[in-house]
Amino acid sequence: YKYVEKYPALYSEIKERCVPSKERAQNTVAIKLRMLQAFYTELEDRDEIDVSPFRKLGKNRRKVVMKESYDAPVYLLQEEFLKVMNTDVPATLQEAKEAFLLQCAFGSRIDDFKSLNMDKVVVSAEGIPYLRYLPQKTLKSNEHKDEVEIPIIRYALDIIKKWQFNFPILKYVTGKSGYNVKIRKLLEYCQIDREVKVFDKDSSDNIYKPLYTMGSSKLCRKTHLDMLTKVQVNMYVSGHHKEGSSAVKHYSSLMLKDRFILMCAAYKQPIYKVDKQLNVIEE
């Protein structure tokens, strides 16, 4: 980011939101460097260059600059999630609230979430609505192009029918008034202020921040996975599932109906059915 003012011509054709304005996180730097290293290694293998510049770094230096580290995952507890769901918010936060709740229901990465549309909604023979899509991040390594199938719980259906996945706020995820900022404002308004631990590289020590300051689209996926993991454990411990049954295996290995029941329990939602037009069938 220090080179933006020094060499403005390099950034003249780049969209403003893509121009670096602050120091990148170490993990981001490490990932980009690994990509560059792979590129130069291939050039070296093809004899297009004599030697990769990464060889000049030395083993120890390369290890340092490419090191990735991750804090303990930050997510909403079930009671915190339900608090957000049940809190009336100002009109300025309503769209962000509903987009956030919907993304938490699916646990989708932000790029996948932004690309969703009504064509991705399917109804099973049992009347269970679910979302079906190909995750973009793993598309290249997904040899058989296996799709993700996520049951749609009751509150998520209402949001989908209202917005049809057309959330204007998702046009800008980052930025001063983007989706991530609105998520933080939403969580602050709902008083989601539990202290969470974050490692500060400048002081080389842990610092503690209110959870709402850590709000972003990434929080949705982590919240989704934590809620499902905990409800599986709770159902097993309480005797609802026998040891070795499919219900205590990894979530993704369960049948659609099992996953639907599990998700309804995790999010405190009623079990329901719909017709092919997504109308709820009263029983």
What are these regions (language model features)?
Residues Y3-S21, V64-Q94:
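Long, amphipathic, Lys/Arg-enriched alpha-helical "connector/arm" segment
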Residues L116-I159:
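Conserved tyrosine-mediated DNA breakage-rejoining catalytic core shared by Y-recombinases
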Residues K120-I128, M214, K230-S252, V274-N279:
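Short, polar N-cap/turn motifs at the start of nucleic acid-interacting alpha helices
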Residues K137-L139, S238-A266:
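Catalytic-site neighborhood detector that most strongly recognizes the C-terminal catalytic loop/helix
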Residues F167, R184-Y236, H240-G244:
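Short, basic (Lys/Arg/His-rich) helix/loop patches that form interaction surfaces
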Residues T41-S52, L101-G127:
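Short, charged phosphate-coordinating catalytic segments
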Residues E13-K56, D111, K185-L186:
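N-terminal DNA-binding recognition helix of tyrosine site-specific recombinases/integrases
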